[in-house]
């Protein structure tokens, strides 16, 4: 019987920094008249015939149930008084680089997860500060003092717990999870909020009666491995606050994509192209967040019989522009010689990053 050894390195000092409602906060900073009003970064559905997707929104808008990846139309229905801003992604990228420079004052072991989120390993840092909490506070102070923006921070001995900690108290919060607090902190948490546990895994866990960290803690290691393979061992460790993944300063992302499965099959060209437009917007949002441009657009289609078709097209210049991605996706779809049949999944991916 295969049992992986449990090795828990609690000697590291990891900080997870997550900017608070980043795009919206930059807009509020640059236009103080927006403060106190619900701000939604996304196309105004009144100007686009209801099309568009929310990139992010401030905390005022979130009180109305608005959130990222929601259609702009639904966001308007929930919050008609919301102020829609299409967004200035070049400005956000420039501010993101300023934040990165602040991180570099303390350590070079930085793993950016997106334009507004990163892990920092400060076990050995440039200033010789022993307290990771002190460094997190200094970073928050620097970001506010120099950029007038707030960030939430999580501090722990691994990335998994630091990420969870940064979500505890927002905005401008700082939460620490110590080794002896890990299991207690995770026990009441919804399993869907465990970083790295996807939707399908959550569904399988629910089938097993697992809804919280405490539930997961009760499941034997071999049961999880039998159900999930090696990922089952990862789940077993996560429930115990164990994760030894290093902070990778040279982490390279090769592609960014979004896909959607439809409960009701798509048949009409109008519906299919409408969905491709929504996917293109989501891909643009993700590309912007990760500061990436790519030269190849990949369209993925899964039909009713579960057969899958993938086709790509290369561009002369790298892009992160929604209009270019949408146009190329439509061109790829138009070039297909498939007989009309129901579509259960559509996916759009951009790769070939520069």
UniProtKB/Swiss-Prot annotation:
Cofactor binding note: Binds 2 magnesium ions per subunit.
Protein source organism: Streptococcus sanguinis (strain SK36)
Domain UmuC stretches: 14-198
Cofactor(s), by name: Mg(2+)
PROSITE patterns noted in UniProt: UMUC
Function according to Swiss-Prot or TrEMBL: Poorly processive, error-prone DNA polymerase involved in untargeted mutagenesis. Copies undamaged DNA at stalled replication forks, which arise in vivo from mismatched or misaligned primer ends. These misaligned primers can be extended by PolIV. Exhibits no 3'-5' exonuclease (proofreading) activity. May be involved in translesional synthesis, in conjunction with the beta clamp from PolIII.
Binding site for Mg(2+): 18, 116
Top-rank taxon: Bacteria
Species lineage: Bacteria, Bacillati, Bacillota, Bacilli, Lactobacillales
The protein, known as: DNA polymerase IV
GO cellular component, one term: cytosol
Documented EC number(s): 2.7.7.7
Site feature Substrate discrimination, where: 23
Keywords noted in UniProt: Cytoplasm, DNA damage, DNA repair, DNA replication, DNA-binding, DNA-directed DNA polymerase, Magnesium, Metal-binding, Mutator protein, Nucleotidyltransferase, Transferase
An annotated GO BP: SOS response
């Amino acid at each position: 019987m295969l049992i992986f050894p449990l090795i828990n390195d609690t000697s590291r000092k990891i900080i997870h920094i997550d900017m608070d409602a980043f795009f919206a906060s930059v807009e509020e900073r640059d236009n103080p008249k927006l403060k106190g009003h619900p701000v939604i970064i996304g196309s105004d559905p009144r100007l686009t015939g209801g099309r568009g997707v929310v990139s992010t929104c401030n905390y005022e808008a979130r009180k109305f149930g608005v959130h990222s990846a929601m259609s702009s139309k639904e966001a308007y229905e929930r919050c008609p008084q919301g102020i829609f801003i299409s967004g200035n992604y070049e400005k956000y990228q420039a501010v993101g680089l300023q934040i990165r420079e602040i991180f570099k004052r303390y350590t070079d072991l930085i793993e950016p997860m997106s334009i507004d989120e990163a892990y920092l390993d400060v076990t050995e840092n440039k200033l010789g500060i022993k307290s990771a909490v002190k460094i997190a506070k200094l970073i928050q102070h620097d970001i506010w003092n120099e950029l007038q923006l707030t960030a939430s921070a999580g501090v722990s001995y691994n990335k998994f717990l630091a990420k969870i900690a940064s979500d505890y108290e927002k905005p401008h919060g700082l939460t620490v999870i110590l080794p002896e607090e890990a299991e207690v902190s995770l026990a009441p948490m919804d399993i869907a909020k465990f970083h790295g546990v996807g939707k399908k895994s959550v569904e399988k866990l629910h089938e097993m009666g697992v809804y919280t960290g405490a539930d997961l803690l009760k499941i034997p290691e071999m049961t999880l491995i039998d159900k999930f393979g090696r990922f089952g061992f990862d789940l077993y460790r996560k429930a115990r606050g164990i994760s030894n993944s290093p902070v990778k300063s040279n982490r390279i992302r090769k592609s960014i994509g979004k896909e959607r499965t439809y409960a009701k099959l798509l048949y009409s060209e109008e519906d299919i192209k409408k969905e491709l437009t929504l996917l293109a917007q989501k891909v643009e949002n993700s590309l912007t967040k990760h500061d990436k441009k790519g030269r190849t657009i990949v369209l993925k289609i899964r039909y009713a019989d579960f057969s899958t078709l993938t086709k790509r097209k290369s561009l002369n210049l790298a892009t992160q522009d929604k209009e270019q991605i949408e146009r190329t996706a439509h061109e790829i779809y138009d070039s297909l010689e498939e007989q009309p049949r129901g579509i259960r999944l559509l996916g759009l991916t951009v790769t070939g990053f520069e």
